[in-house]
Curated annotation (Swiss-Prot):
Substrates-to-products reaction catalysed: ATP + H2O + 4 H(+)(in) = ADP + phosphate + 5 H(+)(out)
NCBIfam families: atpD (TIGR01039)
Function: Produces ATP from ADP in the presence of a proton gradient across the membrane. The catalytic sites are hosted primarily by the beta subunits.
Compartments where found: Cell inner membrane
Cited SMART domains: AAA (SM00382)
Subunit structure as annotated in this protein's UniProt entry: F-type ATPases have 2 components, CF(1) - the catalytic core - and CF(0) - the membrane proton channel. CF(1) has five subunits: alpha(3), beta(3), gamma(1), delta(1), epsilon(1). CF(0) has three main subunits: a(1), b(2) and c(9-12). The alpha and beta chains form an alternating ring which encloses part of the gamma chain. CF(1) is attached to CF(0) by a central stalk formed by the gamma and epsilon chains, while a peripheral stalk is formed by the delta and b chains.
Protein EC: 7.1.2.2
Protein name: ATP synthase subunit beta
Origin organism lineage: Bacteria, Pseudomonadati, Pseudomonadota, Alphaproteobacteria, Rickettsiales
Biological source species: Wolbachia sp. subsp. Drosophila simulans (strain wRi)
Gene: atpD
Residue pairs linked by disulfide bridges in the UniProt entry: none
GO molecular function, one term: ATP hydrolysis activity
Amino acid sequence: MNIGRAIKVTQAVVDIKFEGELPKIFNALKSKLKYKDKELVLEVSQHIGDNIVRCIAMDSTDGMSRGDEFVDTGAPISVPIGRSTLGRIFNVVGELIDECGPLKGKYNLEPIHRAPPSFTEQRIQEEVLVTGIKVIDLLAPYLKGGKIGLFGGAGVGKTVLIMELINNIAKAHKGFSVFAGVGERTREGNDLYHEMITSNVININEHEKSQAVLVYGQMNEPPGARARVALTALTMAEYFRDRENQDVLFFVDNIFRFTQAGSEISALLGRIPSAVGYQPTLATDMGAMQERIASTTSGSITSVQAIYVPADDLTDPAPATTFSHLDATTVLSRQIAEMGIYPAVDPLDSTSQSLSAEIIGEEHYKVASEVKRILQTYKSLQDIIAILGMDELSDEDKIIVDRARKIQKFLSQPFHVAEIFTGMPGKFVSLSDTVSSFKGIVEGKYDHLPEAAFYMVGNIDEAIKKAELIQAEAK
């Protein structure tokens, strides 16, 4: 047994001195004493000479003192994998935190640090993943096995959108979902758990019938837990992809907190910061995780990642580094949220590699392109409208502005997960309905309907009914 002693404790970073063999980088060390009735797990991060290793703590170091003994486990942090993990909530080191008793059934322990799949193992799918959300399905469609980023500042609706995607995709999707709560609010994690129980995605009486695993390292946790919890969840998702040959959904809320935790640790480890105070290894840390989220010949992982944008600045190094790894980006805009249009997705800033006629079909591509053209023209006319008013526009431009405003309103949609706040029943709109509805708007079939009829409805039939109600009330 290789035992070391703590010689220095600095918040989440602990220096341990070993007399014998030094533990390898990423090895887990476990405390012989218990702090707050729990073993403390450390992860080796640096060898700093004189038989001393510098480690990151996965839990609070409160109550620790110099001289406390730690045992080298001889392996990285290892977490349970297998079907028995379904329906349960884990923390970063694979301990259950849902108070539903011990893990039942067979499971193996797997290290959280692994190499990504090789080039020969990877494959690309060109099948669109229908979300039931109009603005996404029409203008920035998602691919099965793709990486999707939801970008937005504070309070523009990232978590609500990710919860609606879980609701729409995980319910319709018969495979398994893994959710990683990285440095977000505990209340939201609790809400999501109960929402999953209500919708039968999680069965608390018979866990083996559940379809989801939850892994939480919330914002009150030390940076070590927040920096590693995404890897813990990813390890569990990889099991379903590689051993069960499943198409897995992997949700992360919020990937920025992963970067932020890395930045906190980097400063405590004494590294010189790079741009805007981020860790010098930002691109490497992000790449090591993102490269593991891949589709292989065994199965696929479709990931949806919420990405907080500090001060609404998309050029900040944290969101900018994430951009390069994604297949589709859904950008949430404060200006659109202020107009009362939810989801507050920016139709011109959001992008998708799958927006091509070969993947989505000729009709869908033409409609999406025309919608973007109308919105872009309206955007360029806004200065003229603000200074001179609508009367100074040509007749053709007036028609474009009218259609653009209807499109803007029609891109809003009531969500199932927001029913309790809005009082409106949620709507799931099929892809064919979305394309045909917008095709009618851009062709001018609905120019006679009032603008208000397009706000917060599902398909175009609902807009027509709403227009009839508005006209009846006007009489």
